[in-house]
Structures are given as C-alpha cells and as structure tokens.
Amino acid sequence: MRKLLTAFLGVSLLLGAAAANASPEQDRKQLLEYYKNKFPNIKFNDYVNGALNLNPDALSQYNSIMEFPPYDSQLDQGKKMWETPFKNGKKYADCFPNGGKKMAGNYPYFDENIGKVVTYEMAINSCRRANGEDELAYNDMKTMGILTAYSRSLSDGMKMSIRVEGEKANAAYERGKATFYQRRGQLNFACGTCHVQQVGNVLRTELLSPALGHAVHWPEYRAGENVTSLQVRYSQCIQNVRGTPFKEGSQAYNELEYFHSYISNGLPMQTPVFRK
C-alpha cells in the first residue's frame, strides 16, 4: 500500500504540474502521450478493449465469448423497449437525430440554455417527459440500463466526439476533472490512482485499465448478464475505496462523465461489451 501511494503521488505531481492550466485538448493529448509511452504496442483504436490489451489470453477468451455474447437476450429486451411506442404513438427514435443512430458519441454535452451537462440518459428521460411518460431511474439497470445498452449500440463505430466550448462548459469540464483526480474514501484513492498512475498493475486481482477508452463502451455487462452503467460503476468504485458515492444523475457524476468521455475523443463507440 505504501509503495502504491508513493507512486501515486509521484505521477500526480508529474501530470498535475503540466496540466494545471491545460485546455481539455491538451489534457487529452497529454494522457494519450502518457499511455503511449507506457504501452507503446497498443494501437489507438485498441484502447476500447481496456485492460484486455494487457493480457493476450484474456483478450482471446473475450473474443471467443463475443462470438455468442451472453447478454443477447437482454439486448433483445432493450430493442423491444426502444421500439415500443409511447401512449401517444411516438417512439424514442423520434426524439433523436437520425432516429437515434450514430449520435450517442456526442453525449455528454454542455447545454448553454440550461447551464449544465446533459448525459445520454438525461436525453432519454427528456424524451419520455416530452411524450407524457414517467422518467426512468438512472440507477435502475433493468430499465434504463437495458434500454441504453441497446440504444447506444446504434452508434457503434461512431467516433466519440465530445465538445467543450465556452466558459461555462470549460468550468463543468474542470469540475469533472477535479473529481476524477480527487482522492476519497478510507483508502484515499482517486479514479486517477487506478486508471492513470497505477494503470497496468494488479490491485485485488483486477488488472487496472487505462482511463482512455473507458467511456466508449457503456453500459457493459459485468459478471455474466448484469448490465452496469458508467455512473453505477462510479458508485461501485467509490464504495470499493470505502467512500460515499454520489447519486447517479447528479451534477458531480455528470461532470465527471463529461471529462471522462472527452479524453476518449476519436475512439470508436462499442456498446455493450462483456467484462468479468
């Protein structure tokens, strides 16, 4: 533990000093360069595979599993939800450009009109409200999770394209970045502890994955057929370090996701995926 914290502090100073006044694009390029130096054999597009890139046997097993994905039945449920008309006869596809295809990579975005970050799940609930339906709970994986696992798959292959433009958007991005690097919980860890400073190491049997590429494949199916959204995963991670998580759909998580997604700009969307 002492070695882990020492290494964390060292790399934190290295990255933090250079990124203190960096623009979002400078942040992204700096992280990419950091990972390229650490893992010179990983091609950019392969970062969608996460920690699997660091374990050839696990990647081979994953590719075999994905020939017959264990979550197909739940994906079918999500498709049915997406295509079932609301009481007024309209569908989810009517709320989004191109019928919901090749557009999820634009989320989250900062909406100047309401002054806050809008996630894809928020857009789903906005669609429901506009059509006289009740909102779905952001942490309900049997509804919101399954629905978005399917609907985000309609954007597979689209490159992540998050924009941070304007003073208020930059402020939201910076708050998300601060949350990413803020240590919390009894273990005093941050998101960046595992996914930047200690990336590639093993912690509690888990091979730690790069933050680059995280945001392009959620929701994902973990431990078989349990669908998990990115923000639910945030809560799980904070609980793992014995901290108090924020609420799914909160400003803190939305802005964290904004930062987290921006650094994966240019990577292809791939939803859902299977992880152990």
Where are these regions (language model features)?
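Bacterial N-terminal signal peptides that target proteins for export
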Residues: M1-F8
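Residue-level detector of functional hotspots within protein domains
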Residues: F8, V48, K177
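Bacterial N-terminal signal peptides
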Residues: F8-G16
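Sec/Tat signal peptide C-region and signal peptidase I cleavage site
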Residues: A18-A22
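Electron-transfer interface patches adjacent to heme c in soluble/periplasmic c-type cytochromes
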Residues: S23-S73, T84-I146, S153-G157, Q182-K276
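Short, charged low-complexity linear segments at domain edges
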Residues: Q61-K80, M158-K177
